[in-house]
Amino acid sequence: MSVGRIDTAALHLLRKHEDAEFVRRHPRSRELLERGRASMPGGVPMSWMTGLYEHATIFPVAGDGAYFEDVDGHCYLDMNQVDIAGFLGFAPAPVTEALSTQAARGSSFLLPPEDSIAVAENLAERVGLPFWQFTGAASNSNAEAIRLARVSTGRERVLMFEGKYHGDVEDVLGRNDGDGPNAEAPGRAAHAARGELTISFNDIAALEAALAGGDIACVLSEPM
């Protein structure tokens, strides 16, 4: 059986049609995006929200379990769940009740609450690692992990794999374009490239060669 070639021109036309239809069906989101551009770059509170999905930006209003609804009344089954950070789903009752109770008592004291000890003890029991430290974002976690690795090893370089994402940290915002390391984002300090190395995932020979140099402080492994 012969297999014909994919008509890429037809695919481009189909994508163009579907993109236009998507925009047409989301007039309220379009209005909010335009309104947002008057006070936020790109019309969104965090710059990465403009390119996270390959469709026009939508604005959610509510979520329940695995589903959420946008301002135009469309309901979605969310297979991403905040990059898996929201693994309990949207608005789980035990979480919302606990948050409401604590908010009424006060929050953000800049002092350690008793619950932090309970959480650390629970994590230690479940995972088997004795000590835990909490951060406000994954980027902060990676930044602190890199610093700890550099202190404990006396080395500087961070080894990563192509296709990775480790947050908005100077030390991990580079990529290997074949002609050496290049910045993934503008404005990164030039010296940051000296502290990183990016290789292909599953290339064991390249990994062994990189580690043999004796200058790798840590390996961050999250190919995407």
Task: Give the positions of each predicted feature.
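Short beta-strands and strand-loop turn motifs
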Residues: K16, W48, L77-N80, A217-M224
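Active-site and channel-lining beta-strand-loop segments
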Residues: T57-D78
